[in-house]
């Protein structure tokens, strides 16, 4: 899986160069996806178990089917959000700019990768700035709940404003952090952090996982 690829790549570079710089880590997130087989080998989406019930008298015209939805104050042509992508490295900028432009053209939403790099390396902010390429897109900012716990709301609000985001995704990723060399180990205070941001920020706050799903217990 992608976690294995990331761990293998990061562990090798950690051994060669010491702890990875935040920009190098972001580059290492791109490399496995471009060159390795990162899909699950055994797990599936379970869609193979879905059987659609055929309706013989639908009483509709196909051309009148409307997939558009309203999400976070903006209308999407379909309930699709390309998220969360990348940022923090010059190669990441091209990915963000290209996909954001596609999302803008097709009426989808677009989510940035973790903006932690912007805090640690302000010179990387441009890799997250996609409004020039996607002026109308529903744009979601991104920060990890662990990092947000240590940041004041004013700092996060400034990061959101700098990229012109319509909302903030607070990502939850303990599984990835546990297997990533140099990853976080303190996951306390997450619920309180999200509640604080919901109250303090001028934009909606969304909780999202990075790939392992949200259990019913966590959702409640």
What spans do the regions from the language model cover?
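Active-site mouth loops of central-metabolism enzymes
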Residues: 83-93, 142-150, 208-213
């Amino acid at each position: 899986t992608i976690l294995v690829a990331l761990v293998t790549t990061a562990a090798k570079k950690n051994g060669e160069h010491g702890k990875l710089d935040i920009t190098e880590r972001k580059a290492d997130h791109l490399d496995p996806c471009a060159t390795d087989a990162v899909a699950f080998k055994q797990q599936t989406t379970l869609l193979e178990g879905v059987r659609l019930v055929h309706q013989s008298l639908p009483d509709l015209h196909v051309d009148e089917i409307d997939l558009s939805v309203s999400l976070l104050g903006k209308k999407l042509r379909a309930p699709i959000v390309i998220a969360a992508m990348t940022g923090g490295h010059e190669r990441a900028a091209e990915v963000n700019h290209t996909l954001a432009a596609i999302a803008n053209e097709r009426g989808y939403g677009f989510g940035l990768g973790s903006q932690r790099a912007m805090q640690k390396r302000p010179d990387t902010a441009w890799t997250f700035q996609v409004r020039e390429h996607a002026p109308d897109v529903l744009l979601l900012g991104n920060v990890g709940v662990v990092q947000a716990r240590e940041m004041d709301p004013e700092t996060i609000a400034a990061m959101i404003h700098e990229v012109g985001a319509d909302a903030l995704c607070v990502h939850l990723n303990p599984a990835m952090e546990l297997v990533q060399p140099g990853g976080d180990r303190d996951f306390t205070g997450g619920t309180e952090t999200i509640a604080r941001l919901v109250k303090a920020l001028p934009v909606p706050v969304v909780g999202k996982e990075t790939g392992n799903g949200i259990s019913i217990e966590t959702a409640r």
